[in-house]
Amino acid sequence: MGSTGLCFYGHCIVMFLLQMVTASSEPFIVNGLEGPVLASLGGNLELSCQLSPPQQAQHMEIRWFRNLYTEPVHLYRDGKDMFGEIISKYVERTELLKDGIGEGKVTLRIFNVTVDDDGSYHCVFKDGDFYEEHITEVKITAINLQVQIHVHPPNTKGVIVECHSGGWFPRPLMQWRDRRGEVIPAASKSHSQGRDKLFNMKISLLISESFFQKVICCLQNPLTGQEERTSVILSDAFFSWNRIWKMILGIILSMMVVSIFVFSCLLHHEHKVCKWKWDAPWIKGLLIMTSSMVTVVLVMVYLHMKQRVPVSDVHFELDTLWVEDISVILCSLMVPATMLVSYTYFRLKDWCQHNHAQRVFTSN
């Protein structure tokens, strides 16, 4: 009876130990944060994961990594943090909070978040040969409160307004709006990234008329929806140069018309031609000057309408000034050049007719 009792107690102890081993290696899954976790640039990031069902995890290996299992962001093994195995860019930047490790819950804290911290993080719990993981997606956000607007000097094509802002991540939505909030089509958009991988944004707007008295530059972070904006009010004075330029061209063209009329009258008076004949000198002179004026006007319109340089190019203003100078030069030279050509044509024609008449007279 005594030996039977000892065997019974021994069997109970063995069963208890087996139950303990089975409980300690109970299968589990790893739960964590669902959906993207947003973190501000330069701040701290906390990522949590927990075993289900809850159980103590002090004896387990807990590994956080990004792309490669062998390159841990943080590693916990044999009841301690293995700082020597952490990859270089996370050295002294991570901490594993283990207050709830008795229930299988840990939190990874990352200090001084950078753009490079954007992406996926794997949390792996390993117990012997059994392991499970949870993947958390991290999105880094950065905004710049400074949005600058630069207004260029007006030219014949209008006023160029540029908006600049740097230090954004990810690339923000950037657009122009009027005072009613409606979107204004931009002339150009561009962006660049520095070594810190932050986006530098630039958007340009060419305003040819004073219709948009107030323009607003808006930038919006696509993840947080946070928006920064600044505005500028353009008075009619910005567009006065456009009216002055049209007035100058109008005066020059008027002088050209008057010159054509005067020159035609002189030819008419000189040759005493009273009838409207297509071979009359004054009509030929009028046709020469009219065709010259039409040609110059067409060339000017072509130069002004053709966009050789985009608005965002640094040489856009230089190109516009070149067009203005060429237009003035063409208008200024057209009248004397056309009159000189006409005068030379008629003088040569008279000289040829005079020589022909002399040869005919001599032969007779």
Curated annotation (Swiss-Prot):
Residues 1-23 form the signal peptide. One of its GO terms (biological process) is positive regulation of T cell differentiation. It is found in: Membrane. Pfam families: C2-set_3 (PF22705), V-set (PF07686). Residues 27-141 form the Ig-like V-type domain. The chain crosses the membrane at residues 247-267, 285-305, 326-346. InterPro entries: BTN3A2-like_Ig-C, Ig-like_dom, Ig-like_dom_sf, Ig-like_fold, Ig_sub, Ig_V-set, IgSF_BTN/MOG. Residues 24-246, 306-325 are extracellular. Expressed in skin and thymus. Glycans are attached at residue 112. It comes from the Eukaryota. Keywords: Disulfide bond, Glycoprotein, Immunoglobulin domain, Membrane, Signal, Transmembrane, Transmembrane helix. Residues 268-284, 347-364 are cytoplasmic. Its main location: membrane. It is a multi-pass membrane protein. Disulfide bonds join 49-123. One of its GO terms (cellular component) is membrane. Encoded by one of the 11 copies of Skint genes clustered in the D1 region of the chromosome 4. This is Selection and upkeep of intraepithelial T-cells protein 1. It comes from Mus musculus (Mouse). The lineage of its organism: Eukaryota, Metazoa, Chordata, Craniata, Vertebrata. The gene is Skint1.
